[in-house]
Amino acid sequence: MENGVVMEDRLIAEEIKKLKEERNAIILAHFYTRGEVREFADFVGDSLSLCREAVNSKADVIVFAGVHFMAESASILSPEKSVLLPVPEAGCPMADMVTVETLRKEKEKHPDAAVVCYVNSSAAVKAESDICCTSSNAVNVVNSVENREIIFVPDKNLGAFVSLHTDKKIHLRPGFCHVHENIGKEDIEELKNLHPEAEFLAHPECRPEVMSFADHILSTSGIVKEAGRSESTEFIIGTEKEIVQSLKRKYPDRKFYPVSKKAVCYNMKKVTLESILNSLQNMEYEVQVPEHVRAKAKKALDRMLSVSGT
């Protein structure tokens, strides 16, 4: 049965490769997607690197192996390209935790504040924001803004982390990533007892009490880089557990322990090779943003990319 599945995946992969050439398409995949999807992708990265790749790519078609807000960001930045989301139901619960209405109310309460919006948000919310950020560049973005007050949406944990690295007043909203929010300090304590020499690399979407245990607090791409340059040979990885497989392949001489077997983003796992093939065959499901929203949202994303050195 396993050989049959492998053969089927190979046939699907061959067909995808053929269609990619015909349509001048590339596949962009997030670190949290399935292993077979990442293996076949043209580029694998976190939100910031995927944004950059979408802008710089010469492809006519971008197949986004990720969730809706990621494909939306690619479409905002590159409207001349067809951006396909293989599974339209692949959403991000955190992105839905802030709406245009709630953001406008926050702006009324804090009229002197600039709005810094995590990219894990809708195009409409980005359009209401002054600048976007990712977990890679949130501190730099906030410190680049002239305003002394910041409305930070939607992730309260990332916002709390940023507040430790700025003298600006940060107004937070109660949004969170369920994957990171569900990581508890008891998970860390258990693994630290089992692997006392291991470095704990935590994502800033984790709760503050979890981050307090961390040796380093880093974005997903930052975790990958730190695992390669550190003198340590053992690591506890405080983010979605899929990244552990990538780390093991990249650094086979090192040991990696997922902080929790429950740290799974099921929306990312919805994307399969079959759904990518269907997407390329039928040119679906194309993500488009209304121009009046796209133009405003693009300004916020462009400002972020200029701060990030893109």
Curated annotation (Swiss-Prot):
**What InterPro entries does UniProt report for this protein, alphabetically?**
NadA, NadA_sf, Quinolinate_synth_type2
Q: Which cofactor does it need?
A: [4Fe-4S] cluster
Q: Name one GO cellular component term.
A: cytoplasm
Cell compartment(s), UniProt:
Cytoplasm
The protein's superkingdom reads: Archaea
Example GO BP = 'de novo' NAD biosynthetic process from L-aspartate
Which enzyme class, named as a word? transferase
- Looking at the UniProt entry, the stretches that span the membrane are none
Instruction: Respond yes or no to whether keyword Transferase is given for this record.
Output: yes
User: Sorted alphabetically, which HAMAP family does this protein's record hold?
Assistant: NadA_type2
Q: What family does the entry list?
A: Belongs to the quinolinate synthase family. Type 2 subfamily.
Q: What is this protein called?
A: Quinolinate synthase 2
The upper taxonomy is: Archaea, Methanobacteriati, Methanobacteriota, Stenosarchaea group, Methanomicrobia
